[in-house]
Structures are given as C-alpha cells and as structure tokens.
Amino acid sequence: MGQKINPIGFRVGVIRDWDAKWYADKKEYVPALQEDLRIRKYLETNLKDAAVDRITIERTEPTRINLTIHTAKPGIVIGRGGADVERLRSELSKIVDTYKGQHKRVNINIVEIRKPDLNAHLVGQQIAADLERRVAFRRAMRGAIQRVQRAGAKGVRTMVSGRLNGADIARKEQYTEGTVPLHTLRADIDYSWDEAMTSYGNLGIKTWIYRGDAENGQFIKDEDVAAAANNRGRGNNRGRGNSRQNGGRSRRPRQGQASTQGRGGNN
C-alpha cells in the first residue's frame, strides 16, 4: 500500500496534520469547501513566485478565517511595511462569502520554511524551472538530489516522466539516494507532484524526501524539520573530521599522475 498511496495522505492523522481545520453542517459544508478552493486558487496565482509550500485554513468562528501560509520567501508575501499582506487580506475579504449578513474576517499568518531543500514541493518546483530552461533532465535531477542530501535528508527519490529531451516516445526515469521507507508510518516523508511546461509537452515530476522519524506520535512541523536537519548536519561533520584525523584511505593516483611520476623518477 505504501508504494501506491499518496505518502502525505497515508500519514494524515498519524504524524501529519490536516491542511483544512474546520467542521460544518450539511448545508454549510459545500459553500465552505468552495470558499476554500477560491482562497487557495487566488493565493497560488498571486504568490507563485513566493515559494509557497502549503496553505492551512482554520475556521474557529463562523465569521473568522485564519490562514497560515508556509513560504520560503516571507519577504515577498509580507512586502515593505506589510503592504502586500494587507492587500492580500483586503482582496480575500472580497472573495469569501458573508455569514448571515456579516462580513468574514480574514487573518493571515506567515510561517517561514527555513530548510527549502527539505521541502518536496519546492524541490520539485526547482526541477520544473530547470527543465523549462532546457536543462538536461538528468542534470536537473542529480543537482536536486545533491542539494537535498546536503540539507540533511536521510533519503530522496525523484522521478520525471514525459517526452524527455524531446523524444518521440514518452518514458520515465527516476533516481534514488539513501532510504525512503514508504511503508513506515512514523517516517516523515514529504511528497510532491509538480509539472514542467516545455515546448515538447508537459513533464510530470514526483519528489519523495525522507526527513527522519517522528517522535512520540507528534505532528511534524517546519521548525522541527529544520532543527533535526541541523543536528544531523553537525553530527556528519564531526564524523568526517574524526575519520580524517584517524587516517582514512587515501585515493589512488590517477594513471596520468602515476606515469608522470615515473618519468620524473627516471630522469
């Protein structure tokens, strides 16, 4: 099951929290859902350059909507002196419906993503941007994997499907580094599906990032991901330093270097 199902939906309620936190009666459910779709569509359209990962919508009262925007570029969303976020709030107030003649109040909270290279959606967007700039797909995928590993991930998998390099027959290729335990529910695996629009057609991009295990069944937060990655990075640096001091294996000289040394010795 873990190989087929969406990894995020598979872990909702276990280590992942919901993106929509509200409850409505039968008559109010459909209007509230349509309202959520309008809000998400507007924000995705107007914040496409702000590196937004996900948007959380919470309704604590019938006349209040709390939005939480997770972004790697909070300055673009907030703007100078908070002008842009105020403009978003006023525009969203016009989009949402009224409740019994009262206008709903929209509150916007901004959460910074401190480790964008550990976010599957942002990594997939970067691969899509590279493919749209005609970068070779293998180079784009390997570059993304290297960035994710340097950020402190335990495993990463990327897949690109479509007319790769303009081939007549569509195919898919994937690269995996480390481990990606899809069946383990406590494993914090971020997943994303993105799309690159090229002159040969659209390419699908799937990204899986294994960021570690959740502790005590708590929901994963962006702050926890950044802290865990920093701890793993410090541990890896200490390990590499000790291996150098103890004397690791030296690299074998290249053939060109060996022949040059031999000629020098004969002279």
Curated annotation (Swiss-Prot):
Annotated protein name in UniProt: Small ribosomal subunit protein uS3
UniProt key word DNA damage: no
Lineage: Bacteria, Bacillati, Bacillota, Bacilli, Lactobacillales
Organism: Oenococcus oeni (strain ATCC BAA-331 / PSU-1)
GO CC annotations on file: cytosolic small ribosomal subunit
Single GO term (MF): rRNA binding
HAMAP family named among the record's database cross-references: Ribosomal_uS3_B
SUPFAM superfamilies per the UniProt record, alphabetical: Prokaryotic type KH domain (KH-domain type II), Ribosomal protein S3 C-terminal domain
Residues annotated as domain KH type-2: 39-114
Gene responsible for this protein: rpsC
